[in-house]
Amino acid sequence: MTNPLFSFSRSPSSRSRLIVGISGGCDSTALLRLMVECWPNPSQKIVAAHVNYGLRGKQSQADEKAVRRLCARWKIRLKVLKVRDFKKRLHQNQKSLQDQARELRYSFFQRLVRQEGAWGMAVAHHLEDQAETVLDRFLRGSGAKGLSGLREIQTLTFSDSEPVLKVWRPLLRTTKKSLEDYLKSRNIDWREDESNEKLAYRRNQIRHEVLPFLSRWNPRLTEVLARMGEVTAAEDQFMDQFLEKTASNLKGRWTKSAYRCQGPAFQKMHPALQRRWIRRTAEKLTGEARGLSFDQVEEILRLWGGRKKGPRDVGYGLSAGIEGSWVYLKNSGLKKS
């Protein structure tokens, strides 16, 4: 990689095959073009992936056509997922639009990675995305975990049938303006998604209202938040590795819908590791537990410590309690938050 817009500390081997997500917008178009210019043998080693959710009618179709033209011009293979009846699925699954779209998108990416024998996925998250993620997590009340930003390389865990997806984010230190300037310098057009301006979405509120307001006190707030996220993401990764070694003493037992471990061994763990292990366990039982609040984690700690009688519903369809010397967390399948 020789382009200065790529500024990362970790990356897959340059011999690897990669799936590159492209929506047609500025960020992903810039990423794909950078990969074409910098990745060895891109026509053989890169496969572009586009999802057409069909939510914006003719605009969605125009996005797909624009992506097809770019990939044909740059001689990059393209795989497209056309989502049928997205709104019907949304109603049936009772999920938010963003969660449903994310689930469909990453499931598609995972299938492509497996089919193409690829290392994983490259996505176009940039410096502002990092800052917004850190601030969003902090505002949701996730505590110190909220300061942990996006990782350059991360392994996402899904269901048993599609367990993992490696994700590379090579643009985390690159600004949005730099990507726009890069495309303009090469006379490359991109698509604009009008929904990115709608303040009905939480992320857009943070981008267009909260960050600009807070930046009145620190004009470099976006950069500060992004760097904080980068540092804490590395520390978070170290803590996860340390946690795995410590948790081996718990003699934990997993089933598809439950986890249990020795209560006395759990109580010997440092409180910081206890909270982290509860979050890890809850998220493994249900992906929706990513939204588990500090108070809900504390509730599980009280139940597991015998300071509160159980079993009790602790949110997201999970219940916690004690059975003899064992403490447990179960997924009842009821999707409450």
What is the predicted role of each segment?
Residues 60, 64, 106, 175-176, ...:
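A structural signal for well-ordered alpha-helical scaffolds and beta->alpha junctions
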Residues 88-93, 202-203, 234, 322-324:
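Short, solvent-exposed polar/charged micro-motifs at secondary-structure junctions
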